[in-house]
Amino acid sequence: MYRPRARAAPEGRVRGCAVPSTVLLLLAYLAYLALGTGVFWTLEGRAAQDSSRSFQRDKWELLQNFTCLDRPALDSLIRDVVQAYKNGASLLSNTTSMGRWELVGSFFFSVSTITTIGYGNLSPNTMAARLFCIFFALVGIPLNLVVLNRLGHLMQQGVNHWASRLGGTWQDPDKARWLAGSGALLSGLLLFLLLPPLLFSHMEGWSYTEGFYFAFITLSTVGFGDYVIGMNPSQRYPLWYKNMVSLWILFGMAWLALIIKLILSQLETPGRVCSCCHHSSKEDFKSQSWRQGPDREPESHSPQQGCYPEGPMGIIQHLEPSAHAAGCGKDS
């Protein structure tokens, strides 16, 4: 018996919901920003005010104790100290820290520029360097995205390879995909987020929590600049340190991009934006999940050749664009 297909929901509107999905997404976005604003204001506002009052009090006491200093001269000294810090000097001891505009420091600055991390603790001061930085970033940022995409594709191929081998051994493709995806997630957590803080704790004198905070803020390209490697004036850093951290940033960003891609695929799935308004009937489930054979017996809706169901990490189904269009773009 022929049954008419249900009318598809208009584009930009969640099925069964009167509110457009774009409006719901914008409201959720603004609500999330409001949440962050309130929490950070509550946690950091009073501490910032106390720090400012303490600085002004110390400055006033310095002027009272050393009458030879006048206020303009002290303000000029403070500005010079701030500028010296921006130029790479650390005035906490008699010597400066790593020369950040030396060869290794310049390489690390180039990495932080094209990866858009931008810690903010170091910036070019000459006009020639600023102009070069503009063109360097214009070419380097797209190039970095291409490299990250290629590295992510290689990671996907590795996971797919292990999933196919495990599936052939166990004769259970679903379990193999789940195990391969979970292994990729756990190994990435270990290599890029859990183990590096141990190195940072040893080299920088940070706690493990501070090292983990730096690792995530760096790989997510947030880059506040409150924690930056190579800035401890009492530490002698080996030459390989920043180079190895640069490689960690490159591969870690590719791995984290896969995880963020999975989260985005879950958030952008139609019907999950407004789950309270989504109602699926038994007939809808039948029409989407089963087909009737010649004897009116339900048969499984198997994917076409070249199309694979989505695994637990959302990486098994990704194919080359041409193969996907040829195998999945038309209904059988």
Curated annotation (Swiss-Prot):
Chain intervals for the UniProt region annotation (Selectivity filter 1): 116-121
Any matching Pfam family: Ion_trans_2
A single BP term in Gene Ontology: potassium ion transmembrane transport
InterPro entries with a match to the protein in the record: 2pore_dom_K_chnl, 2pore_dom_K_chnl_TASK, K_chnl_dom
Binding site for K(+) 4: T116, T221
Catalytic activity: K(+)(in) = K(+)(out); Rb(+)(in) = Rb(+)(out); Cs(+)(in) = Cs(+)(out)
SUPFAM superfamilies, alphabetized: Voltage-gated potassium channels
Subunit details: Homodimer; disulfide-linked. Heterodimer with KCNK5 and KCNK16.
Protein name: Potassium channel subfamily K member 17
Species, as recorded: Homo sapiens (Human)
